[in-house]
UniProtKB/Swiss-Prot annotation:
Reactions it catalyzes: prephenate + S-adenosyl-L-methionine = carboxy-S-adenosyl-L-methionine + 3-phenylpyruvate + H2O
Name of the protein: Carboxy-S-adenosyl-L-methionine synthase
Function in brief: Catalyzes the conversion of S-adenosyl-L-methionine (SAM) to carboxy-S-adenosyl-L-methionine (Cx-SAM).
GO terms (BP aspect): tRNA wobble uridine modification
Length: 241
């Protein structure tokens, strides 16, 4: 696994963070060292797939990156005639997802599309995964995407929504940000790396509160919405149609 050193030296003109070739190459290392609880979420996505995916249906992984959630779901699906569609708008990510997924044999077909998730039709879905993806969409586009997902889910279908959160209590928000930075330093990132990546993400990742997510999901129509996992200011929610 290639080590993430992208922000380890001073960058004179620090642009916005993008999921380019450099990020795609080191992404597994970057996400494990940057997102507390990531491996737990990936494992649980497989458990949820085993429980919720039904025969003759589709599973969507929107913002699939290198395919970790797709693979976790596929390993655990027991039903027949299921197809998984993974989507990522980064060509380097989509290419690596194809390579990664095709390295493992399975009877369950996986199609990886390089496209904007807002362009994708959601049809006959028993499960949709948004694993740290919605936060990169413009805030004004989020409800429309969730409405499309809701319409495309079959009754009893599941949405898994993992995100970085902000907290309305400023003291708590600052504490959890600091704990996250401590987590990153404990995983070998320097102060320079932490600060440069934070600056690069500032304009491209707009995060919501847990309550904002819950209210929006309920307003879209989901019958059951709950936070099932949280570590510091990162977490994952489930919404059942």
């Amino acid at each position: 696994m290639s080590k993430d050193t992208i922000f380890s030296t001073p960058i004179e003109k620090l642009g916005d963070f993008t999921f380019d070739e450099n990020v795609a190459e080191v992404f597994p290392d970057m996400i494990q060292r940057s997102v507390p609880g990531y491996s737990n979420i990936i494992t649980a996505i497989g458990m949820l797939a085993e429980r919720f995916v039904t025969a003759d249906s589709n599973v969507y992984d929107l913002g699939c990156s290198r395919g970790a959630a797709t693979l976790s779901a596929r390993r655990n699906i027991k039903q027949a005639n299921v197809k998984i569609i993974g989507v990522d708008n980064s060509q380097p990510m989509a290419e690596r997802a194809r390579q990664h997924i095709h390295a493992y044999h399975s009877e369950i077909p996986v199609e990886i599309l390089c496209d904007d998730i807002r362009n994708i039709a959601i049809e006959n879905a028993s499960m949709v995964i948004l694993n740290f993806t919605l936060q990169f969409l413009p805030p004004e586009d989020r409800r429309a995407l969730l409405e499309k997902i809701y319409r495309g889910l079959n009754q009893g279908g599941l949405l898994v929504l993992s995100e970085k959160f902000r907290f309305e209590d400023e003291t708590i928000n600052n504490l959890l940000i600091d704990l996250h930075h401590t987590f990153k330093r404990a995983n070998g990132y320097s102060e320079l790396e932490v600060s440069q990546k934070r600056a690069a993400l500032e304009n491209v990742m707009r995060i919501d509160s847990i309550n904002t997510h819950k209210v929006r999901l309920k307003n879209v129509g989901f019958s059951h919405v709950e936070l099932w996992f949280q570590c510091f200011n990162f977490g994952s929610m489930i919404a059942i149609k």
